[in-house]
Amino acid sequence: MTETVKPTYSLFEITKYYLKLGTWGFGGPVALVGYMHRDLVENKGWLTEEEYKEGLALAQLAPGPLAAQLGIYIGFAGYGVLGATLAGLAFVLPSFIMVVLLGMAYKLYGGLAWMQAVFYGVGAAVIGIIGMSAYKLTIKSISKFDPAAMKAKWLLWLFYSIGIAITIITQKEEVLIFLACGILYMIIKAPPRWIKKPAIVPAVILIGSGFWRYDGKTLENIAWFFLKAGAFVFGSGLAIVPFLHGGVVKEFGWLNEHQFVDAVAVAMITPGPVVITAGFIGYLVAGFPGACVATVATFLPCYIFTLSLAPSFKKIAKNASIKAFVDGITASVIGALVGSVVIIGFRSIIDFTTAVIAVFAALALIYLKKLQEPYIIGIAAAIGLAIKFL
């Protein structure tokens, strides 16, 4: 959408739409971008097919949660920085409020038997859901598990395998590995002009509920950690899981394994972007200030990247070097997600029952197409309660 064309919708209307989508938009990133196409292109006619595809392409190219980034872009396309800001805030605010309320309940009642029973089932289901999401992301972003396709994309599969191995071995996020994979793939597949020229290339250096309970140093750590995590969300909000697990559980020790899985589950039962789990984690660590800082830090890279790229995106989108760089990073990040599933799975699948629940969750996503993640989580919670109290 160009600046000379006046949008057919008002700033209030687009803000109201994203507030509604953030409140009722269940189903994860793929479902959310589908809702936007149905509502904004097919039903309301606010966007053309070409405008929608341009926004979706930007959301897939740049780091950040897919649905939130598309929403910010659409807001920017109609009403500039103000539109992007209001659309982004409206989209994230409902789920943020929900995870803060759930965080309060979790802190107050998390030690009670019924709450532990709920998350006994939920934790296992989360493993199945994340595992299936990792499988779908692998096929979508790298290639199908077909010998010919895998041979054609062998280097991306190598980066993917490296991501799995490094994550399992180190049990934390290795940002420099992801950057190295992106740079190497760019150099091999589509080297920039300055690399092709016979000139000296400059070196690149990679460098009660506790509502108000926090300390300044913790907030600084939360801000810096979630800022880094938000900058490396490629393909799906679930790609943030390995980053969060490595830092939240291993590096800082803010949460234990079960609390971390519970945090991921909370994100799945609330509408809006999956990365809102950052707000829940922030609340558990440092109360309401922690929730605010973690959420802002996670979404800030997405917001900045979108506003920076949107004005000249058509030119950037044709740059083969940038696309190759993103492809390389994406392959290793998805590999890290698979590695995280393995690590968390070994600690969450504690008996035969939890193994069955995890398998059920994965199979439900395959064979029961209309059964969305929140319903699967709800069924798993009911099973957990039944097992513990019946």
Residue ranges of model-derived segments:
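Multi-pass membrane proteins that catalyze or facilitate reactions on polyprenyl-/lipid-phosphate substrates
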Residues: 1-62, 69, 73-270, 274-390
